[in-house]
Curated annotation (Swiss-Prot):
This is Hsp90 co-chaperone Cdc37. InterPro entries: Cdc37 (IPR004918), Cdc37_C (IPR013873), Cdc37_Hsp90-bd (IPR013874), Cdc37_Hsp90-bd_sf (IPR038189), Cdc37_N_dom (IPR013855). The keyword Chaperone applies. One of its GO terms (molecular function) is unfolded protein binding.
Amino acid sequence: MSRIDYSVWDHIEVSDDEDVSHPNIDTPSLFRWRHQARVERMEDFKKKGDDLNKGLQECRRKLAEAQKKVRELSISAAGDAKAELTKTQTEEKKLKKEERDWARKLEEHNHEEKKMPWNVDTLSKDGFSKSIVNVKADSAEDTEEEKEKKHKTFVERYEKQIKHFGMLHRWDDSQRYLSDNPDLVCEETANYLVIMCIDLEVEEKHALMEQVAHQTIVMQFILELAKSLKVDPRGCFRQFFEKIKTADQQYQDAFNDELESFKERVRGRAKIRIEKAMKEYEEEERQKRLGPGGLDPVEVYESLPPEMQKCFDEKDIQMLQDVITKMDPTEAKAHMKRCIDSGLWVPNSKMDESDEKEDGSTYEEVKQEQEEPAKKE
């Protein structure tokens, strides 16, 4: 089975300021991975049932063959037939036990299926293969610009209420608040809550993130339920709360599984954003360090021979002159040029007066500085 493609999250940008505009947010795509995960679990459950049924049928086929063979051997009185009969009867006994095991597992699976909690994919079934009803035609999908404008306008108007809803804990409180503020039951609220979760995780406010994540899943369930029933979300949110408040432990566990999976995705997205921000910061710092020749002094320093690194560590020019003298001239010139281009070594004013000097001038300069004291002696 192919893995879920989570790349739909890549376009969600975590704001680092007070800008409430988050362009190009597509809630159906954003939550599609949750729906896909649930569908895959349902498919896995169905496949398990099919495998159990196939196993039971295969076991029964082998048992029927063994029983037939036992009847045939029972008619024969030959010595060899008696030995084979004993062996076949043992096999028959083994297959009967396996049949009971397969049947028990299949019965448990079927019982588990009946206890499975409802979701937006199983809540409603087709009652008729065809219906003739006058329905409102689907409106044209909003453009990206329209989505951005709609989201920005909504957040500007309801940001305070959305944040309040995100901090609620009890089912009754959430239902009551949505009853008082039905306009919050929409995709724009879900958009804001998701981004709010990622922002909080980036800021390392983990407890708050988990609280808002809970309310995000609540809103997601309501929106998916409305989509399945083809009704306005504002008209079915009470139905969700009635179910969740009276659900058995298994249904509550299913809700919690959805919540935990969502929080893991939030942590993953936050980690990616933090790593991206760190890389951008490191690149900015690197650009600030670049020398006149466009090289990074840190990278150049790390590429130098240990003996040259020691010269720069101790800021000892005499030591550097000695090291340069002992090195191969070509290698020394190359190292000194990189040192200048990165700003590790700053030539004297004489060297800056002419741009036409060769790259080896720096090497000659260091060498000359070493020879001049010797001449004076």
